[in-house]
Swiss-Prot record:
Mn(2+) binds at residues 156-157, 191. NCBIfam families: damage_ctl_Phtase. Coiled coil: none annotated. This is Damage-control phosphatase PH1575. A motif (Subfamily I KC motif) lies at residues 263-264. Subfamily I proteins are distinguished by three conserved motifs: the CxxC motif localized near the N-terminus, the GNFE motif localized about 40 residues from the C-terminus, and the KC motif localized about 25 residues from the C-terminus. In the crystal structures of the subfamily I proteins, the side chains of the cysteines in the CxxC and KC motifs face each other across the rim of the putative substrate-binding cleft, and the GNFE motif lies deep in the cleft close to the metal-binding aspartate and asparagine. Changing residue 108 to A: Abolishes catalytic activity. Keywords: Hydrolase, Manganese, Metal-binding, Nickel. It comes from Pyrococcus horikoshii (strain ATCC 700860 / DSM 12428 / JCM 9974 / NBRC 100139 / OT-3). Metal-dependent phosphatase with probable damage-control functions. Shows phosphatase activity against p-nitrophenyl phosphate (pNPP), but natural substrates have not been identified yet. Low phosphatase activity against 8-oxo nucleotides suggests that it could hydrolyze oxidatively damaged purine nucleotides or their biosynthetic intermediates. InterPro entries: ARMT-1-like_metal-bd_sf (IPR036075), ARMT1-like_metal-bd (IPR002791), DCN_phosphatase_I (IPR053636), PH1575-like (IPR014444). It holds the Pfam family ARMT1-like_dom. One of its GO terms (molecular function) is metal ion binding.
Length: 287
């Protein structure tokens, strides 16, 4: 997905949040935002993909600010709340595959870029459980998972990965496939890293691998050899969240299923769904 007109202000707003989280020094904040403006002028162009352009800008800001993980407190709070809510859900609900898919999508609400507060998670989950998927290819996903030999599950945000675990557990119940679970090489906004996935125990559910990059989504020209091998041999690829949609949506590959909440107008418009819609969509480009 190429940048839309809203992406510029979204990136600028995220830069401001990063700066405010990283330092209280007003002069450093001012100079950091001047740098951000220069970086935006460089990276925001008609061929840019939002997730990639934003990541390159954010990582340069991290260097300037001397803070390699300004979202650490937000991520820890998200992790704590998500673990509790996921445990409650597993005790209260009778989970089948389709509900597990829905929960994995609902978990995608945990996102700093849209101003989500982790304290609201339980209430948001209860509310969204009543919603139907606007695009629902979960039956196709179920059939593909059943016959797959290799499955690649690409995670998105910290906290959300506890909801991913619910779906991966269901996948393992219906499939004997080798499951690869991918996280980021290092911190970028509130995305889940390999370290986050391992700390949450996802190694028990599959082989945890790194994308080989800190860029949001999975720009295939920048990923590791290990990730590319898992990607190439996968019979099913489950890609969580908007960043993965932005970087993979133009690839002509029907193995990919996008699971996300359309949290911004640009992504919603690209998907042809209302903002806020829950989506389980097989890649629209067919092999």
């Amino acid at each position: 997905m190429k940048v839309q007109y809203e992406c510029l202000t979204c990136m600028a707003n995220q830069c401001q949040r990063i700066v405010e989280m990283a330092t209280q020094d007003m002069d450093i904040r001012r100079r950091a935002m001047i740098l951000a403006a220069k970086l935006l002028a460089k990276e925001y162009n008609e061929n840019a993909i939002p997730a990639i352009a934003g990541s390159l800008i954010f990582l340069e800001l991290y260097k300037f600010l001397g803070n390699d993980d300004p979202f650490i407190e937000y991520k820890l709070k998200s992790e704590e709340m998500a673990r509790k809510v996921a445990d409650i859900i597993k005790r209260k609900l009778k989970l089948d595959f389709e509900l597990a898919v829905k929960l994995a999508i609902i978990g995608n609400v945990i996102d700093f870029s849209v101003g989500f507060s982790p304290e609201d998670l339980e209430e948001e989950v209860e509310k969204m459980l009543k919603d139907k998927l606007y695009i629902d290819d979960s039956k196709e996903l179920f059939e593909e998972v059943k016959r797959a030999e290799n499955i690649l599950y690409i995670t998105d945000n910290v906290g959300e990965h506890y909801f991913d675990a619910i779906l991966i557990e269901k996948i393992r119940e219906i499939s004997n496939a080798e499951v690869y679970i991918a996280g980021k090489e290092g911190p970028i906004i509130n995305d889940a890293t390999v370290e986050d996935l391992k700390r949450a125990g996802l190694e028990k559910l599959g082989k945890v691998i790194s994308t080989g990059t800190r860029i949001v989504g999975v720009p295939l020209k920048l990923v590791s050899r290990e990730f590319m091998e898992a990607f190439n041999k996968a019979d099913v690829i489950i890609a969580k969240g908007q960043g993965n949609f932005e970087t993979l949506s133009e690839i002509n590959d029907s193995r990919i299923f996008f699971l996300l909440k359309a949290k911004c107008p640009a992504v919603a418009r690209e998907l042809k769904v209302p903002k806020g819609a829950l989506v389980c969509m097989r890649n629209k480009f067919k092999l």
